[in-house]
Every structure is written in structure tokens, then in C-alpha cells.
Amino acid sequence: SVLVAMIVWMIVGYAIFAVAFGAAASLVSRQEDVSSVSMPLVMLSMIPYVLSFLMATGDTNSMTFRVLSFLPPFAPFMMPARLVLGVSSWTEQAIALGIALVFLPLLVRGAAAIYTRAVTRTGARVPLKEVLRRAERA
């Protein structure tokens, strides 16, 4: 049913963004600095949210809407909208869910790498570029 699909997408979307925010939060050691790393992610998470509304009120069967709805950060917002609007089949829902479930462990692995490289630093905020540079050397 549609309600079950919406709940599944909510859980998958929550997991994707929770892992991303966890990785970002590991870059700071002081509570006061959390907003500086979380604000860009908040803004990025608003893009799929707003696009899902804009596309749902426009041409619901556009190629852009269809392609974006398969990308993991966009799928939790766009696939439920496409399902409710009747422009998505259960096969498309399953494919998008499969892509998101493959993406999630990769995201967790990347977040874990960021965390392990950033946790050794204390004091000032660790720039993401520095963490990624350490990853290249390791």
C-alpha cells in the first residue's frame, strides 16, 4: 500500500541524512561549532525537498523528475510523491529503493572513514579537505 511505501521511504531518507549529519558532526569537537558544519547539509537537504514540490505541481512525468527520483538523496522525497500522483510503478519504487539501500552502506563506510580521521583531532574544527587528504595518504 501507499502508506507502507511512504513509511519505508521515510526510514530510508532518515538513515541517509542521519549518516551524513553524523559524519559532518564528527568534524567538530565543540558544541558551538556544530551549526557551522550542519548548516550546509541542511541547505543541501532542502534541495530535494523543494524540488519534489516544484516538480509534483508541474510536469509530473518529466524526464528530470524521473531521473532525480532514482538518486538516493532525492528518492525519499520524490518517490512517495510520484507514487501518490500515480506516475510511478511499484517496479520503479523497488529499483529506487534498491539503489538507496546499496548507497546507504557506502555512505556509512565513508562517514566512518571521516569519523576515524577526524576524531583524532581536538580543538578547532577539522576542515573536510584535510580529512579527505588524510584519506588519500592512508
Task: List each model region and its residues.
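Short helix-loop junctions at transmembrane helix boundaries
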Residues: 1, 27, 82-84
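A structural motif at transmembrane helix-loop-helix junctions in multipass membrane proteins
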Residues: 7-44, 56-58
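Hydrophobic alpha-helical transmembrane segments of integral membrane proteins
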Residues: 43-59, 125-126, 130-138
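Membrane-interfacial helix-loop-helix junctions in multi-pass membrane proteins
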Residues: 53-102, 138
